[in-house]
Amino acid sequence: KGKNPQQYGIGFKEIWEIDEKKHDEGLVMHTAGWPLDNKTYGGSFVYHAENKQIFLGYVLGLDYQNPHLSPFDEFQRFKTHPSIKKILEGGKRISYGARALIEGGLQSLPKMYMPGALLVGCDAGTLNMPKIKGSHTAMKSGMIAAETIFSHIAEKRSLSIFEDKFKKSWVYKELYEARNVKPSFKWGLILGIIFTGIDQILFRGKLPFTLKHKHADHETLKPANKMPKIEYPKPDNVFTFDKTSSVYLSGTNHAENQPVHLQLKNPNLPINFTLDKYDEPAQRYCPVGVYEVQIENSIPKFVINSQNCIHCKTCDIKEPSQNITWVTPEGGGGPKYGNM
């Protein structure tokens, strides 16, 4: 109550082993924009790690408007930029993963306490978007939670003191100063960057107003016939790859014959409504091809390949009718990320 709708992004990450001559341990690269258009929020990271490895990724805001857009293919296309391609040339992709990130910031923080539980870290949404980091704020919120629980047990104090402690911490101050960055990109990449420069460099995040998130991510898609189609190049299997080979590198696995953990509230909606209005965007926003529309005897059929799911939860967030619910699968199945 009284909060803005939460905002999300889908983050992709690959680990590459590259030519030793191109490796510079500790080097950090960040980019914004390309290959996305001016109206779509996104950016990349390249981190040179140990053992000739780099961590390469792209984060794309799930408030995008074009249902023809494929976040996975935008990430693959990003790797064809000359500055990135020259790093990867002669290298080998060894791991792949994807995950939804909470990007709403201070305006979208939910109530963080309830009977018997506290919300901390990314469950609450403490990611600092301008810094592209959240592990430090997550750890601090966990420390505040520990202090709160101790007071609750030892002094019989209410868990509501958690929010009081949180608001007095440096985490709240940091999120307050970063609060206007993400919503400013609703004006487009160029204006968003200009505003962010003014807000963060000149005013240090202390402008006397707070921009709002007006729409949830599932509300932003426009009808497919109103938006331009996007033709993505076929993967070259050197720099760019398909979803099938990528899901293999995620190590995902689910026990056979278990109940499908991607549940449809209305099983007829994907074909009877979403396919016609939005060209069924689940075919594209899923980073591993869980959802397909297959034609059988000239009749379209919505297929869920739940065994491929890497638990990114993008479908639960972006589905325009909120018809898909992600629930925990049986048997501890899912991706095996290892060094990711």
Give residue spans per PLM region.
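Long, low-complexity segments enriched in small/aliphatic residues
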Residues: I193-N253
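Intrinsic low-complexity, disordered N-terminal segments enriched in polar/charged/small residues
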Residues: A255, L264-K265
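Terminal low-complexity tails and localization/encapsulation signals of metabolic enzymes
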Residues: K234, K265-P270
